[in-house]
Amino acid sequence: MGGAVVDEGPTGVKAPDGGWGWAVLFGCFVITGFSYAFPKAVSVFFKELIQEFGIGYSDTAWISSILLAMLYGTGPLCSVCVNRFGCRPVMLVGGLFASLGMVAASFCRSIIQVYLTTGVITGLGLALNFQPSLIMLNRYFSKRRPMANGLAAAGSPVFLCALSPLGQLLQDRYGWRGGFLILGGLLLNCCVCAALMRPLVVTAQPGSGPPRPSRRLLDLSVFRDRGFVLYAVAASVMVLGLFVPPVFVVSYAKDLGVPDTKAAFLLTILGFIDIFARPAAGFVAGLGKVRPYSVYLFSFSMFFNGLADLAGSTAGDYGGLVVFCIFFGISYGMVGALQFEVLMAIVGTHKFSSAIGLVLLMEAVAVLVGPPSGGKLLDATHVYMYVFILAGAEVLTSSLILLLGNFFCIRKKPKEPQPEVAAAEEEKLHKPPADSGVDLREVEHFLKAEPEKNGEVVHTPETSV
C-alpha cells in the first residue's frame, strides 16, 4: 500500500517524466484551481443574490454545496466517460458545460434556476475536467509524480486568492449577472487546458503480443484490494471534518470580538501558507527514502491536521487563531498534495480512473454531511470550541484508520517473489530438457496443421482473438 507503482500507463508507454508533461502539469494546475476555488469564489455574489431573489443566506449557500456535490458525486460517471472516450474529449465537453452553466445563470429569474445552472451544469463541467486532468498527470509522471501532484494541487489556493477579489471586482462594476457572464467566459479556458492533454500513444512493434482486451468502463475490482478499501474509508471519514474549520474560522473570530476585516484576513493567511505547503509536501514525498512510505506520511499529515483543529478549539484571541491558521494551512496543504499520490501508489495507473471516481463518490456524502453537522452542533451549543473538537476528532480517527490498517492488514501480506527470481524460475520451467531431442519446428508445424481435435478448437496465436 505504501509502495510506489512504476507508471507505464494503460498503453504500456513509460511515463516521460517531463517534456510535454510540463504542459499537462500546467493544465492540471489550472483545472484544479477552478474546480476547488470556484465553489468558494462564487460566495462573493451571495449578498446580491439574497437581495435579488428575497431569500436567506442558507438558500444561497446551497449553490456552493451543489457545486461540490457534483464535483465529488459524479466521480463514477467521469470514470465511465474517460474509459469510454478518453480524457481529452471528456474535458473539452466539460469545459463547454462549465462555461454554459455560468452564462445561463446570468439570465436566471429564480434561485432554483441558479441551482440548476451554476450548481448542476457548471458543477458537472468542472467534474468532467478535474478527474481526467489528474489521470493524465499521473500518466505523464512516474518518478516525479509526487512533486507533480503537489504543484498541481497548489492551483487550489492560488486560484482562490485570485478569483475571490476578481469576483468582488466584477460584482461592483457589472453586478452579479455581468459577473456570472464574464466568469462563464473565463471557464472556457478549461477547453484550452483540455487541448494540452495529449494522449500517450504506443507505436506497434513487430513481434508484439496481441492487443490488450478493452478495460471495463467502471472497474469495481478495486474493492478487492484491501489497501484501496482502507484508503476509501479513511478518506471519507477525513472529509467529514477536513473542510469544517475553514468554514467556521471567520465566524469564530467575529464571535471573539475581532473586526470583520481582520477576521476575513485569517483565510488569506491560511491560503498563503497552503500555496507553499503543497509543493513542499510533494517534493518531500518524492524523495527516494520517503516515497515507499508515502502512506505513512499521508497518515501523519491527517494526524497533524486533527491536532491543529484540537489546538484551534482552545484559541481565545486573534493571535491564537492566526497560529491555528498557520499550522492548519501546513497540514491542509500536505493532505491536498498527498491524497491522490497515495491513491495512485495503491491502485496503479490502470485502475486509477475507476478508483478516483469511486473515492470521490464516497467523499461526496461526507462533504454534504460534514459542514452542516458542524452547523447543527453550533446551533445547539453556541460554542465554537465543540465544532473544532468534533472536526479534529474525525480527522484524527481517519489517520488512525489508515495508519493501523496499513500496519496490521497490509504489511502482513505474504511477500511476493522477487522479479528476477520469478523470471528465472519461469524460464527454467519452459526450457526443454537438453536430451529431449524434440524438434521445436515440428511441434509448431503440428499445432498449425491440426486446429481441431475431437471436435474441440485449439486456439493458437493465429486463431485467438
Curated annotation (Swiss-Prot):
GO aspect biological process, one term: plasma membrane lactate transport
Chief location bin: membrane
Domain of life the protein comes from: Eukaryota
Keyword terms: Cell membrane, Membrane, Phosphoprotein, Symport, Transmembrane, Transmembrane helix, Transport
Gene: SLC16A3
InterPro entries, sorted: MCT, MFS, MFS_dom, MFS_trans_sf, Proton-linked_MCT
List of residues that carry Phosphothreonine: 460
Effect of residue 426 to A: Leads to a nonpolar expression pattern. Affects subcellular localization leading to apical localization
PROSITE patterns tied to this protein: MFS
Tissues of expression: Highly expressed in skeletal muscle.
Species per Swiss-Prot/TrEMBL record: Homo sapiens (Human)
Entry's free-text remark on domains: Two basolateral sorting signals (BSS) in its C-terminal cytoplasmic tail are required to direct SLC16A3 to the basolateral membrane.
Effect of residue 198 to Q: Does not affect lactate transmembrane transporter activity
A Gene Ontology cellular-component term: lateral plasma membrane
Region described as Basolateral sorting signal: 423-441, 441-465
Single GO MF annotation: monocarboxylic acid transmembrane transporter activity
Extracellular side: 39-61, 106-109, 171-179, 249-264, 316-317, 373-384
SUPFAM superfamilies xrefs: MFS general substrate transporter
Subcellular location: Cell membrane; Basolateral cell membrane
Name of the featured protein: Monocarboxylate transporter 4
Reactions catalysed: (S)-lactate(in) + H(+)(in) = (S)-lactate(out) + H(+)(out); pyruvate(out) + H(+)(out) = pyruvate(in) + H(+)(in)
